[in-house]
Curated annotation (Swiss-Prot):
Gene that encodes it: ilvE
Function, as annotated: Acts on leucine, isoleucine and valine.
Pathway(s) annotated for this protein in UniProt: Amino-acid biosynthesis; L-isoleucine biosynthesis; L-isoleucine from 2-oxobutanoate: step 4/4; Amino-acid biosynthesis; L-leucine biosynthesis; L-leucine from 3-methyl-2-oxobutanoate: step 4/4; Amino-acid biosynthesis; L-valine biosynthesis; L-valine from pyruvate: step 4/4
Catalytic activity: L-leucine + 2-oxoglutarate = 4-methyl-2-oxopentanoate + L-glutamate; L-isoleucine + 2-oxoglutarate = (S)-3-methyl-2-oxopentanoate + L-glutamate; L-valine + 2-oxoglutarate = 3-methyl-2-oxobutanoate + L-glutamate
Enzyme's top EC category: transferase
GO biological process terms on file: carboxylic acid metabolic process; isoleucine biosynthetic process; L-leucine biosynthetic process; L-valine biosynthetic process
Family label: Belongs to the class-IV pyridoxal-phosphate-dependent aminotransferase family.
One example GO MF annotation: L-isoleucine-2-oxoglutarate transaminase activity
Cofactor(s) named in the record: pyridoxal 5'-phosphate
Name of the protein in its database record: Probable branched-chain-amino-acid aminotransferase
Amino acid sequence: MLIWWRGKFRRADEISLDFSLFEKSLQGAVYETLRTYSRAPFAAYKHYTRLKRSADFFNLPLSLSFDEFTKVLKAGADEFKQEVRIKVYLFPDSGEVLFVFSPLNIPDLETGVEVKISNVRRIPDLSTPPALKITGRTDIVLARREIVDCYDVILLGLNGQVCEGSFSNVFLVKEGKLITPSLDSGILDGITRENVIKLAKSLEIPVEERVVWVWELFEADEMFLTHTSAGVVPVRRLNEHSFFEEEPGPVTATLMENFEPFVLNLEENWVGI
């Protein structure tokens, strides 16, 4: 693990926070999670824009320009000989930024994962906007405590609509059509989600962004999740419902196969890198 704090790269045991900063961080720190592809920071500008958007909810200053942000990302990633996961935290009041770099170790997910429907409902948009990425969101914290013997849990909205996983976006396939909850369902505008939608359209796979009801998941032909670290993650089982035993369905498999080449060649993912 490598940490960037107050202009320097440091080891974890070299970091100390004064108590007032620690206390404020307990109120919630704005954050983003990035990764590298071919050891280059993926979608840095989009992540920076989202970080600033979250900061704006609190009228927080962001102490780094985009150029400074990318310099830290690239310098930190260069210290590793493999792909890297990067967590970026923006502390309340001060606007100071902390980067945490760690090796990206993704297990083999091609055989699919099991997910479950969470008992926790998504906080309504008027209470906490889904576009706000902040540590300590109570719905996410409580939902993640339910992740036992499964990969992720799916949060529903107050009306029973499908929202998202505790760290992922949700997709289903029905009769060859790709369907995903629309942004007004109460979800984060995931960057990997956006790339998968663009990939599907480039492959002439029909895409629907709309309100999705929980029963539709159980009637789907295929289901998968998307998130920064792993890209496209096929769902083998939802609660007691099985989607496949050996291999993901054809649409999921096609998107998995084409995802990395697509994101590597989409120029908007590499602005400033």
